[in-house]
């Protein structure tokens, strides 16, 4: 199975990343199972974290940055009274304090962390300094000055606290570091805190129910060995369309000659009520997505980002 020739695979897989492996490790496992030539993930999850890790195959990667800009939802459990070197349970405990809190103090602290807030990215992160990820400096005991970032915490809900644990769900903008938010919460409560459980539930408009596990892919592989069915055909059916990351954009349809010219990178005349907007361009002859275009005020459709003609 793993000696198959690499394939041209195109589409989006919503992977349910398991705990204990890096996002890149999860990507490589899935890429190998699909025997895919090209694939990349969107939105790094720490080894501790589980949940939604979108993987873009082939031409889908051209549109992946739209997902990078999207909001995300997480389920978080934090342990109070202990601050760690990594702000999660993978690190070592560097400070312990008594937990002297009540429900009012918790709600007040979380309210302060809702809305537009400032965060300093943690040293244990993939952000690069002089081309080197910060976590590599951190492992050497170095502390690099990081710029303050503004992030938007839309909502913190389903709050539950019992003994030294606090649980909640957070809906936030791109670039939010949940570990940093939990550490800041611990400081506001005066006892310290770190993440012991983190799961990404949603990203953009994708739902938790759409996730696919690595174990399920292996189950299909074992089934192929025991039964006569096409493994690749089965797993390719799990992929979402190439234009899935831009599904929020309106569609426009082109006739064959228009479609041909558009795919050559030529501007085409197009009458529409849509003005000054990006649109998904669909070829009428086969109903396939051929790229993104922008309709200007002069009723012209200008190519913006094209799907390779070789797959249409």
Curated annotation (Swiss-Prot):
Q: Which domain of life is it from?
A: Bacteria
UniProt keyword annotation of tRNA processing present: yes
InterPro entries attached here? PsdUridine_synth_cat_dom_sf, PsdUridine_synth_N, PUA-like_sf, PUA_sf, tRNA_psdUridine_synth_TruB, tRNA_sdUridine_synth_fam1_C, TruB_C
Q: One MF term in GO for this entry?
A: tRNA pseudouridine(55) synthase activity
Q: Which NCBIfam families match?
A: TruB
HAMAP family given for it?
Answer: TruB_bact
Q: What does this protein do?
A: Responsible for synthesis of pseudouridine from uracil-55 in the psi GC loop of transfer RNAs.
Protein name (Swiss-Prot/TrEMBL): tRNA pseudouridine synthase B
What is the protein's species of origin?
Answer: Buchnera aphidicola subsp. Acyrthosiphon pisum (strain APS)
């Amino acid at each position: 199975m793993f000696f198959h020739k690499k394939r041209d695979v195109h589409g989006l897989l919503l992977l349910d990343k398991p705990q204990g492996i890096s996002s890149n490790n999860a990507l490589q496992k899935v890429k190998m199972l699909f025997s895919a030539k090209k694939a990349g993930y969107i939105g790094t999850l720490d080894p501790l974290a589980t949940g939604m890790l979108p993987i873009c195959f082939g031409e889908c990667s051209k549109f992946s940055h739209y997902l990078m800009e999207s909001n995300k939802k997480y389920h978080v459990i934090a342990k109070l009274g202990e601050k760690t070197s990594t702000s999660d349970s993978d690190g070592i405990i560097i400070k312990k304090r008594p937990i002297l809190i009540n429900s009012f103090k918790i709600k007040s602290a979380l309210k302060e962390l809702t809305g537009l807030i400032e965060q300093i990215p943690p040293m244990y992160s993939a952000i690069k300094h002089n081309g080197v990820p910060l976590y590599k400096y951190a492992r050497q005991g170095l502390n690099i000055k990081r710029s303050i970032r503004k992030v938007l915490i839309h909502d913190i809900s389903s709050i539950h606290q019992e003994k030294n644990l606090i649980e909640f769900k957070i809906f936030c903008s791109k670039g939010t570091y949940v570990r940093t938010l939990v550490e800041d919460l611990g400081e506001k409560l005066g006892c310290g805190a770190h993440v012991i459980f983190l799961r990404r539930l949603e990203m953009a408009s994708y739902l938790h129910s759409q996730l696919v596990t690595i174990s399920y892919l292996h189950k299909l592989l074992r089934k192929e060995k025991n039964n006569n069915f096409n493994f690749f055909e089965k797993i390719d059916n799990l992929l979402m369309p190439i234009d899935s990351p831009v599904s929020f954009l309106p569609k426009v349809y082109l006739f064959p000659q228009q479609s041909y010219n558009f795919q050559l990178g030529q501007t085409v005349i197009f009458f529409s009520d849509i003005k000054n907007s990006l649109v998904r361009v669909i070829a009428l002859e086969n109903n396939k997505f051929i790229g993104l275009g922008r309709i200007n005020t002069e009723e012209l459709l200008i190519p913006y980002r094209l799907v390779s003609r070789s797959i249409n």
